Amino acid sequence: VASLACAREVLRGPCLVVYGDVFCRRYHLQRLLLDEADLVIAVDRQISRHGDDTDPRDLVRARHTNQTQTPFTEEDGILASSANSDHFTDFDGEWIGALKLSAKGAAWVCESLDTLPAEKLSKMHLIDLLDLLVKAGRTVKIQYVSGDWLSVESLVDLTHAGNL
């Protein structure tokens, strides 16, 4: 969040905020940009784990406007809460690290950044900022994706990035 705060002066929207270590197919980003909602995130229903990997991930809980929503329907959701956690079964999916902001969404993010003390900014993660926005009453739309993205954490991951 500290690096996002450094870019505050140019954060006007519409824009994408994407983790620097994320590789994904272009259509994930295009779909985010085409969405008219003010705050939109891409979430994979499959939480990526490798073998016995129990490292925390950026996880989200969703609420859906359609009460018959199942993990297999394509309807987008609304972010209910988010956290960096290793309690995988308590969440509905993994945020891939891509956030689309409209002009209004960018203003909301800047407002949230302005409320945070410097010491909290330096320790806070983007997933925490998303949760803060939800707690402030902002609606964060979820677009579900199914694979075709990768967070590069190792040289092995980097070699897999070539497959995207």
Where are these regions (language model features)?
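Structural beta-sheet core signal
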Residues: V17, I41-A42, I142
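Short phosphate-binding loop-to-helix
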Residues: V1-P14
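Conserved alpha/beta core of the MobA/IspD/sugar-nucleotide pyrophosphorylase nucleotidyltransferase superfamily
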Residues: D90-L164
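Conserved core of the sugar-phosphate nucleotidyltransferase
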Residues: R25-L116
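Short beta-strand-to-loop acidic/aromatic patch adjacent to the donor-nucleotide binding site
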Residues: G13-F23
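Short, well-ordered alpha-helical microsegments
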Residues: L4, R25-Y27, I127
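Short coil/turn segments at beta-strand junctions that form active-site/ligand-binding loops
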Residues: G13-P14, A37, R138
